[in-house]
């Protein structure tokens, strides 16, 4: 796997120069999952029609250093910790984007009555969306808003020395209604401290959306449904990032589907210790792509 490397952009540029425009692109993304949608017992085959943007930000607090025996208040770490806590307390606003709306409309009829009523009348229950996002949490909640995850931190290298700088890294995944600029401004507005710098170190916008209504979608959805019979096939918003986004420059319908059934436990093993795929799922993956290619 190449992470943010030069290969995919180079391939796209090569095809563009030669006038090649693929009718459809299928890359890694969603899977056949269960336990994601509250109260829905059937497995759901989620196919990404778009993916979130990606953004890295470094928060840096600065103040006078010194010896730990005579500490200054507020310290750089104190200011940084307050900034992190304020950011986590003030999450981004939830949005009903096109992929999420499609997911709710497709899966909603299989949900318990209360949720079914909400998803069948999204035009009416829109104001409940922020509350719903918070209560759903996990993967569904993350699909509805820009998320932020604090992942790195650095202060003094000596326990008895006050650092003049303390920093924390935060990774954001952006829905398409948030931009790197607006997301950075949100962090600044929440932190409200000129001594804490908000520096964007890397950013890319969310991808365009593929169609979930044209002939390409119908062909893909049928191949998925015929391979994993009994599953609910639905569009969704992919929360991770992939190199397939580059192909949006030459192809409208870029779909993100890993073509295998993955339990919650198996999804948790992705990029983790003991990552693995059952052999039987590899066979289903081959079956799916064979069926898809024969139907085109």
Residue locations for each model-derived region?
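Short, solvent-exposed loop/turn segments at the edges of secondary structure
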Residues: 20-21, 41-42, 50-56, 143-145, ...
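Flexible glycine/proline-enriched surface loops and loop-helix/loop-strand junctions
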Residues: 40-43, 60-67
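Acidic/histidine-rich catalytic neighborhood of metal-dependent amide-processing enzymes
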Residues: 1-46
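A short core secondary-structure module
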Residues: 8-15, 64, 68-93
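Hydrophobic beta-strand positions in extracellular immunoglobulin-like domains
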Residues: 61, 172-174
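An extended, acidic, His-containing surface patch that forms the Zn2+-binding/catalytic region
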Residues: 33-34, 93-160, 164-165, 176, ...
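Flexible glycine/proline-rich, aromatic-decorated loop/lid segments
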Residues: 29-31, 41-56, 257-267
């Amino acid at each position: 796997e190449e992470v943010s490397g030069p290969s995919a952009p180079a391939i796209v540029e090569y095809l563009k120069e030669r006038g090649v425009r693929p009718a459809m692109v299928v890359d890694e993304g969603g899977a056949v999952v269960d336990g994601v949608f509250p109260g829905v017992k059937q497995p759901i085959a989620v196919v990404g029609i778009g993916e979130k943007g990606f953004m890295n930000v470094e928060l840096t607090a600065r103040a006078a250093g010194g010896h730990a025996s005579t500490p200054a208040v507020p310290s750089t770490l104190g200011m940084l910790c307050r900034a992190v806590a304020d950011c986590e307390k003030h999450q981004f606003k939830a949005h009903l984007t096109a992929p999420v709306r499609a997911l709710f409309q497709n899966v909603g009829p299989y949900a318990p009555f209360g949720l079914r009523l909400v998803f069948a009348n999204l035009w009416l229950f829109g104001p409940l969306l922020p509350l719903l996002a918070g209560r759903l949490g996990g993967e569904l909640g993350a699909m509805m808003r820009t998320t932020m995850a604090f992942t790195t931190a650095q202060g003094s290298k000596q326990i008895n020395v006050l650092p003049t700088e303390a920093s924390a890294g935060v990774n954001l995944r952006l829905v398409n209604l948030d931009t790197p600029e607006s997301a950075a401004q949100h962090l600044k507005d929440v932190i409200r401290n000129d001594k804490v710098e908000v520096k964007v170190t890397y950013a890319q916008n969310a991808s365009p959306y593929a169609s979930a209504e044209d002939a390409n979608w119908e062909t893909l959805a049928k191949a998925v449904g015929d391979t994993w019979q009994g599953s609910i096939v639905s569009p969704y918003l992919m929360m991770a990032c992939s190199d397939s986004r580059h192909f949006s420059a030459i192809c409208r319908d870029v779909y993100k589907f890993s073509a295998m059934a993955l339990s919650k436990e198996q999804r948790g093993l992705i990029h983790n210790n003991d990552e693995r795929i059952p052999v039987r799922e590899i066979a289903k993956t081959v079956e799916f792509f064979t069926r898809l290619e024969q139907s085109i």
